[in-house]
Amino acid sequence: FALADCLLNKQPLDVIDIIKRSGLRGRGGGGFPTGLKWEFAHKQKSDIKYVVCNADEGDPGAFMDRSIMEGDPHSIVEAMCVCGYSISSSKGLVYIRAEYPLAINRLRIAINQARQYGLLGDHILGTEFSFDIEIRYGAGAFVCGEETALIHSMEGKRGEPTLKPPFPAESGYLGKPTNVNNVETLANIPIILTKGAEWFASIGTERSKGTKVFALAGKINNVGLIEVPMGTTLREVIYEIG
């Protein structure tokens, strides 16, 4: 699987290069190239770095991230480990809405299973790499979906965004370099590393690669989750699918 291949066969910059070539962009709304974000965090010199999964899904009617955490929490655990290896971090934090009890429970089970199998903790798969994950709970404030507000909330401060720079990759959680990706972004990492950057880049448009998950709700015929290639028009999503 992806984590074992990275730890045993690839250097951190090799992994980052694959993510860059895949063209994966942040799925939280900003659309920033994920590989570049990881590269920025990798370049920072610090004794401690953090990997943060933004699971604070606050958009009305949105349940994409919740469905991923309920259905495949292991993909998030694996992706966070891969990110930790890539940027030289040993600590992961998942910031999740307290209103998602099933997602929290399944994520907690996945983390404990990973520890039992030696996929989290000290010397993962017999290597020098150590990484562990803990869960932090959000109180439901919509603004905490923004990464600087999220970091403030995790620090016990008021969840207010701050101007960048500095970016979290330079000075984030507790003033240390911090890489923040949302759930859907991270869920793409294992499949990219398994099937290859070229495979992922073959889906979507020239500037936006891969697929996007949408939650359809409201006055339509078909409510629920859909996954479509990037570049699919809103007309197709609403009138042909919804």
Where are these regions (language model features)?
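Gly-rich Lys/Arg/Thr-decorated short loops/hinges at beta-loop-alpha junctions or inter-strand turns
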Residues: 1, 53-65, 168-173, 215-220
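Short amphipathic, charge-patterned alpha-helical segments
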Residues: 79-81, 231-242
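Conserved alpha/beta core surface patches that mediate binding of polyanionic ligands
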Residues: 22-46, 66-72, 194-199, 204
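Hydrophobic alpha-helical positions that pack around
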Residues: 104-230, 241-242
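Short coil-to-beta-strand
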Residues: 45-54
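Conserved phosphate/anionic-ligand binding catalytic regions in large, soluble enzymes, centered on
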Residues: 20-41, 83, 140-152, 156
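Histidine-anchored nucleotide/phosphate-binding helix
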Residues: 72-86
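Iron-sulfur (Fe-S) cluster-binding modules
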Residues: 1-21, 89-94, 210
